[in-house]
Amino acid sequence: MCRFVDAIKSLLDESDITTLVALANRLSPFRVDYRRVVVGDALSVKPILVLEHEQPPCDGAWRSAAHINLGLGAAQQQHHPVPTRAVHGAAVGGVQCDGLASPPVSNNVMSDGTVDGDDDDLGYDQDTLYNQGTDYENEGGAVGQDGLPAPDAGLFQECMFSHRSASTPRAGGHGESYCQEVAQSSHAITCRELLERCILPNFEINHLENCESSTSGGIHHCLPDEHSGMTGLARNTPSASPVENSITVELDGALEIATDVRTGKFNTLRAAKRHRRNTSSLRLSSHDAGCVGDARSSAGVVKSPARRSTAVSDAALRKVKYAARTCIRADYFQFLEANLPRWVRDGIWGKEWSPNQTANVDGYENLQKAYWHVCRLDRQMRDDAIRSRMAMVLLHLEYENTCLSWKTCAHSGKKPVTKVGRGNISSLIDNIIENTHPEWRTADPGERSELRAKFHDRKRYGKRWWMLVKPLGSSILMLCSSKFAGMIKNTTVTAAMINEIKLAIQRSETGLMSLLSLANPIAESLFLDQGYDGHNAEQVLKALRAARLEVAPGEGVA
């Protein structure tokens, strides 16, 4: 039994949201229900497992994700603080009792904005956004198990934006600040406890530290300290270090959330797309917009085709600025002064391509050559980062060119022999790997899969560098710092972030583009391995000396 409990804990700690949703969906005949319990003088929301046929859900109770489809998009003009007001003598189920009551809140999602008139073009029926079966007619709220008020659908949202409404009069006319009462209680439920005890469908909230309710802080004191691909929180607190991990605000398999820079309000997918056409990037700029739950959050989201947000968070933008500031190695001039004369004389690639490597590569010799260079550099010149970057970019370009040639039937060479489950391109890659790695012929299926994975990994890295080479020029491959190269190789730096890095370098006022432009002609010749002997190294160095760039100190060599 202990091992079963440990296994479940490990699953909950390590699995992604997809795995957890699958687990929740397979709990039948059990389901997750929520029960309010009173601990001392404070309210606690406790998730419990119940058998479907033994304890059917009460009318008005907040049902689990398997029974309710909550969504984003509805807007109401009022907020309700955390429902913790003690009510003595409240009528619950016709019985007079003491306990805690909550405001009459429906399952509709609350927002501090107005109804987005463009929500009707999202591609799904707006009527499915809400649960229509819950009725909160009584002041005491719906009645749950054990004679206690059932939890509201807005309970989690109310805690999330309680720091806004701490001093806001209640919609029903009450002016008390109930969230302050909770914070002052020694037994009050904290945001951390609420997040631990509530299931938030389709969201994953990772690494919440130091998350305590307070009269002055609220939920924006929850500071995640590690990157997460799906997180419901974004940190806006300025950082003392520019190299923090990226925190993105995006929903996996659900509706995207973006922020209007002018109003600080969250928009739906279409509004976000329109806004992205008018601004270079979307960022969470206001302190109040620091949490998804502040404006248009709920305990669930409308299920729609999976989309990824192209917006970049505040923390990611700080990382982008740091990358742009440190993209050039600090010793770039000394480095070029020592190597440029030799490169102009001999080129950068060194060993000539061996003709005997072209066996069985009719029609895709260039792709074979590019991959041969990548592998040779890995084996013999592990310290030669510049040539490795150039080789990976060439591998990506030749692969794209070869695929285009095959797909458009422009290829006139002999097609490789295909096998079951292996098409033309896959068989072509197998031939290239076989020509490069002699051990391919005796490798088992697992070893062959590993060699294929290495091929595609190098090609993907080349594609990421090509995203920078195309707008900035080949000199970025030659002059970049080791920190910058590490960021580009790190897959947590998304394609959207690489695009922002490119824009930041282009808009830099420190002379970055001037420096790269001066080095681009000779870098391109070295990259293409042609015409490099026609450049005058002394003139290039003289121009670079006149355009000396102030770079961040302490940047390591590439």
Swiss-Prot record:
The keyword Cytoplasm is assigned to this record: no
Predominant localisation class: nucleus
Gene disruption phenotype: Blocks the expression of the aurovertin gene cluster and impairs the production of aurovertins.
A GO term from the CC aspect: nucleus
Domain of life where this protein originates: Eukaryota
Keyword list, A-Z: Nucleus, Transcription, Transcription regulation
Intracellular or extracellular location(s): Nucleus
Family: Belongs to the POU transcription factor family. Class-3 subfamily.
Function: Transcription factor that regulates the expression of the gene cluster that mediates the biosynthesis of aurovertins, fungal polyketides that exhibit potent inhibition of adenosine triphosphate synthase.
Protein name: Aurovertin biosynthesis cluster transcription factor aurF
